[in-house]
Structure formats: C-alpha cells, structure tokens
C-alpha cells in the first residue's frame, strides 16, 4: 500500500463556505473510502460536537459517513475501523498533546503508511510533518514531544503569508522560519498559502491550488514554488 495524504493550508479561502474550496481536492481520496473518523482535538474554543457538525456539513455533498473520535469509547479502535482519517485545524499544541494522551501518534502514522487516506487542514497539516516546530500557534499546552506524524519528512507552515501590517514591529512569518532554518539548516520547510494543498501519493508529492508555496531550507529563503510543481524530491 502507498501513502495517500492531502495536506490543506486552511479550511476556507477568503469568505468561501467551510471546506468548499477543498472539495475537488478531497473527492479523489474518498473514492474507495466511505467511513471516516474526524479528530477534533485542535478545536479548543468550541465543543467537539459543534466542530464535527461543521465538518459533516462542509463535506455533505461527498455523502461520507463521518464520526468524531470523541464519540467512540476506544479511540485507537475507531482509527483502525475507519476507511480514512480527517484532522481539523485549531491549536496544534493541543492537538498533538491529545494525540499523545490517547496513544494515537504511532498508530495514525502506521495506518497512513499502510494506505489509509489522510486529510488534514491547518493544525491537521502541521502534525503531518516531522514536528510541530514551525506552527504559528500559541503553545497553550505542552505535549510530551514536538515530534509529529512524519507523513511527510519535512516541516510545514500552513496559512503562510509574509504580510506585515503598517506600523507593526513584530517579526514576519518569513523571519520566523528563517530562525528555524538557522537552528536546523538541513530540514526543509514548506509554507502553504491559503487555498493550496500538498498531495502525497506514494513517492509523489504535488502542489495543488491557485497559489504558490514557499520553500525555506538553509540559505534558501522564501523560494516560490509554482502551482502544480512536482515536489517529490522532498520525500527523499
């Protein structure tokens, strides 16, 4: 079996309805997967039931059977029984903390490596990389480790933007990622702009959407990656 993973930058683009822009990207992963488990652990400011309802509504036209992992007495068994895994956005630190709490990190990695489709957005994309060291989120809770799912062997930065508000004196996103590459100059970081996604199919990795992505690695800083690019070399 081969990895089939879709890593979305965000759940929305601008004012579009929830997950609507992503439906064309998501649909191919559902061709042979009807029963999906949704992991809402990144959702800190809403109930898990509310979060689940939003996802079910957003993906309704795909006619999937989606349940929340919080509805199952045995989270590990729920993942094993599902045809596919969905992980939503929110706070990446809380998400990874809960994945470790319920002993799901290695299980999810194993299931995805064995061919179970994976779809993540925002925090759900953050945890698909080597670690969560390039998330934008506030560290509101401390997971046992920053080591993540390693579905792709590099770092991700969803919601990438290098906008600086006039008069604002804080660091830009590019400056923050430069800091990472100074500490770890050999690990690539891919900044994914809202509306775009990475799709891994086995040993192939491609950039989907309407916006370029940006690569940071060592002395290479904010290198544009054109839409449709083959990024398979990042998997080696």
Swiss-Prot record:
It comes from the Bacteria. Keywords: Cytoplasm, Dipeptidase, Hydrolase, Protease, Serine protease. Its EC number is 3.4.13.21. The active site is at residues 122, 137, 159. It is an enzyme of class 3 (hydrolase). InterPro entries: Class_I_gatase-like, Peptidase_S51, Peptidase_S51_dipeptidase-E. GO terms for cellular component: cytoplasm. SUPFAM superfamilies: Class I glutamine amidotransferase-like. This is Peptidase E. It comes from Shewanella sp. (strain ANA-3).
């Amino acid at each position: 079996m081969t990895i089939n993973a879709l890593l979305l930058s965000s759940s929305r683009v601008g004012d579009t309805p929830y997950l609507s822009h992503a439906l064309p990207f998501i649909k191919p992963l559902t061709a042979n997967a009807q029963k999906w488990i949704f992991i809402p652990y990144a959702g800190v400011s809403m109930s898990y039931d509310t979060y689940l309802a939003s996802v079910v509504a957003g993906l309704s036209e795909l006619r999937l059977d989606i349940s929340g992992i919080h509805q199952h007495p045995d989270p590990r068994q729920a993942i094993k029984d599902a045809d596919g895994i969905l992980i939503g956005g929110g706070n990446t630190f809380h998400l990874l903390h809960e994945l470790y709490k319920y002993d799901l990190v290695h299980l999810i990695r194993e299931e995805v490596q064995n061919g179970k489709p994976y779809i993540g957005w925002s925090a759900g994309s953050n945890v698909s990389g080597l670690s969560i060291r390039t998330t934008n989120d506030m560290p509101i809770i401390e997971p046992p480790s920053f080591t993540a799912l390693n579905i792709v062997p590099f770092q991700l930065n969803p919601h990438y933007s290098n906008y600086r508000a006039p008069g604002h004196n804080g660091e830009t996103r590019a400056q923050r990622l430069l800091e990472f590459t100074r500490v770890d100059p050999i690990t690539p970081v891919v900044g994914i702009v809202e509306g775009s996604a990475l799709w891994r199919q086995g040993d192939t990795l491609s950039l989907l959407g309407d916006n370029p992505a940006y690569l940071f690695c060592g002395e290479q800083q904010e290198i544009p990656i054109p839409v449709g690019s083959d990024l398979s070399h990042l998997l080696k």
